[in-house]
Amino acid sequence: MENNHHLAKDSLDELNPKRGKGEHETQVSQYTVVEEATIPQSLVKTSRSADHKVMEASKVADTRTAWSTKIPAVLLPVFVINIALFKYLVFANFSTKDRVLFGLGNGGINIFSMWLLLATYETWFRSIKEVIVACGAGIRSFPQKRGVNMLYAILKLTFVNAFAIPLLMFFRSHFEQWRLGCPLVERVIGVMLNVAYFIIEIENPGLFTRVFNKYCDCLFAIRDILNRN
């Protein structure tokens, strides 16, 4: 029996000269180990995470569809307010300091008016205090609860444009020789700032959100002051 076993091993080695003697035994043991291996836990966790993301995406899609009928009615008055204030800011005879303050106020008015309209449109609050409380609480939880990320992006873009307005006014105030070409320069700067905003959001998504939340804290402060009164 032993002679037959050695002859079988020698015949295998002769069929494949590159294989060292006895190497087939090692490969057989390796295959045995592979068969006994279990699925890595990391793959299981990844699969569960993917399933969870699919479920969340479907919920967001359903919510976005439900809100699609409300978006035009809510945004139209906000854009009208924005255009009116912007035109007044451009053509009014303000100093640079006044323009900066008014520009920041313009962004604040847009943010607050959007939330005022959203809150009033949805639940018809009975008092201004309740509207401010709802707006302040909703700003931080809006993307998670509503799922309408487009509105949240527009909200933050309004905040970015509030800083863009004073910069545009700087060109109109200090470069009189550019007055004829100033509208084009203003549009280019506005587009560049909005593109820069999206780049920042992609590269460092938490940076602008932290700044935006600081701005939202002002609304919470207003809410607290009104609640004391």
Curated annotation (Swiss-Prot):
Main location (coarse class): endoplasmic reticulum
Segments passing through the bilayer: 71-91, 100-120, 151-171, 188-208
Topological type in the membrane: Multi-pass membrane protein
A GO term from the CC aspect: perinuclear endoplasmic reticulum membrane
Family listed: Belongs to the WTF family.
Lineage per the UniProt record: Eukaryota, Fungi, Dikarya, Ascomycota, Taphrinomycotina
Subcellular location: Endoplasmic reticulum membrane
Name assigned to this protein: Wtf element wtf14
Basic and acidic residues biased stretches: 1-26
Keyword Transmembrane carried by entry: yes
UniProt region (Disordered), positions on chain: 1-27
Biological function: May act in meiotic drive.
Domain of life: Eukaryota
Keywords: Endoplasmic reticulum, Membrane, Transmembrane, Transmembrane helix
Organism from which the protein derives: Schizosaccharomyces kambucha (Fission yeast)
